Structures are given as C-alpha cells and as structure tokens.
Amino acid sequence: MNLDALQQRLGYRFSKPELLQQALTHRSHSAQHNERLEFLGDSVLNCAVADMLYGMFGKLDEGDLSRVRANLVKQQALYEIAQMLQLSDTLRLGEGELKSGGFRRPSILADALEAIVGAVFLDAGFDAARALIRKLYIPILEQVDPRTLGKDAKTLLQEYLQGHKIALPQYNVIATHGAAHSQQFEVECTVPKLEVRVFGTGASRRAAEQAAAKLALDEVQKLVPQLLKRSRAERTGKTRKQPVPQDPQLSLRLKE
C-alpha cells in the first residue's frame, strides 16, 4: 500500500511506516488491527486538544473548555477530519466490511483517525502528535465561536434573551401527528416582548422544541438590534437640549 499521499496530507512522514499501515487496518481485515492504537490515540488527542484550548482561550472557564473539547473530539468531528484527509481511500477492511460500505462509516473513519494519532505518538512522541493535532484543528477553531460551540438552540436562545434582559421564551405543544410509534410533534415557541411566534416539528417533543428554538433565535437576532437602535434614538431625542423660549418683556428692555 502506497501511503505517500496520505503522509503528505497529514504533513507528517513516519519513520516506521508499518505503524501507519496498522492504524488504517480494521479488525475485520487482520489480527494486527488498529484498536490498541485507537485507544492510545484517544488519550493523546484529548490531552493535546485540552492543551491547545487552554492556551488559545484564556477567558473560558473549566466548564466551557470541557464543552468545546468534547465537541472537537466527538465522532462527528473526527469523521469530518477523516473525510478531509481522504482516509476512506486508504483503509484496510475485510471483504464483508468493504462490501457493506464500511469505508464510509463514520465510526470506522473516526477510529482510524484516532489510531493515526496513536501511531504518530509511538513513532515520534507527544510533541509530534500534538503538532499534527494542531495542524488539523487550528483551521476549525478559526471558524467557530468557542462560547457557543456545542450548545443547543434552546440554550443559545435563552442566553441571548437573558443577555438583553428579555423574558424567556414559552414552548407549547400544539399538535401531534401520526401513529404512536412514529409521532411527529409540533411545538410553538413565542417571545412575547418581540412578538415572535414560530413553529417547529420533530420526532419528539424535545426535538420539536429545539427546531422551534432555532427559528426563534434567527428571528430574535434580527429584531433585537433594531429594538436597541430605536431605544437609543428615543433616549437621544429626550436628552437633546431644547431651545429656551425668550421672555418678550426682557427683549423689550434690552432694546431700550
């Protein structure tokens, strides 16, 4: 297997290429698979990402740092990075796994990426693994807001309204559709002060509330700046110095 192209995409060349080959080997292919490397890489990845976040975001507290890290190392995030690296083209899978589309499966790709991190750690140590992780994650971190990453729509809406001293939204289930085993919920979300009223649907009440909250947040973020602008204009109008009316008698005396 020629892995030169992958090493070029990684920006790292292995002194022991067999480690990279093992990192790309699924247990369905052979006994020399990547699960132990995956275990090792998971720990290295968590440590390196924590170190990176600690250095980059000095104002985030422990809870926010943990939330951001959890979202950066979860399966979906690893899967997207694996796709960017085109790991599907280099995976070693057993015939059955290959036929069932295992090379596209998020869990297999995410595990392979963690195994690669573990392989780099064994090949050259923690600093080399950390450098690889920074290379992969810095472009992602430059495009996300760490204050909101991983927060659901209901939380974001609540925090936004609280930040502007606006009463919290109200959620009401207004309808359910379908059979008991496949119901669809319809939820209304209102923000009375802003006259926002939107509707969301989902397979559960929670999912419908989240869908409605996302729509409400979009509306609220459009309306609040307008509200603040009007409020400032009104305050400016009230405090603007009014001309003092002249006393006619005083004017006559001055003319004398």
Curated annotation (Swiss-Prot):
Record: active site: 42, 114
Alphabetized UniProt keyword annotations: Cytoplasm, Endonuclease, Hydrolase, Magnesium, Metal-binding, mRNA processing, Nuclease, RNA-binding, rRNA processing, rRNA-binding, tRNA processing
Gene this chain is encoded by: rnc
Annotated residues for binding of Mg(2+): 38, 111, 114
Essential cofactor(s): Mg(2+)
Subunit composition and interactions: Homodimer.
Pfam (any one): dsrm
Catalysed reaction equations from the record: Endonucleolytic cleavage to 5'-phosphomonoester
Lineage: Bacteria, Pseudomonadati, Pseudomonadota, Betaproteobacteria, Burkholderiales
Function summary: Digests double-stranded RNA. Involved in the processing of primary rRNA transcript to yield the immediate precursors to the large and small rRNAs (23S and 16S). Processes some mRNAs, and tRNAs when they are encoded in the rRNA operon. Processes pre-crRNA and tracrRNA of type II CRISPR loci if present in the organism.
Residues covered by the DRBM domain: 152-222
Subcellular localization(s) per the UniProt record: Cytoplasm
RNase III domain: residues covered: 3-125
GO biological process, alphabetically ordered: mRNA processing; regulation of gene expression; rRNA processing; tRNA processing
Entry similarity comment: Belongs to the ribonuclease III family.
Residues forming coiled coils: none
EC identifiers of the protein: 3.1.26.3
Cellular component GO terms held in the UniProt record: cytoplasm
Protein name from the UniProt record: Ribonuclease 3
PANTHER family registered for this protein in UniProt: RIBONUCLEASE 3, RIBONUCLEASE III
Residue numbers spanned by region Disordered: 230-256
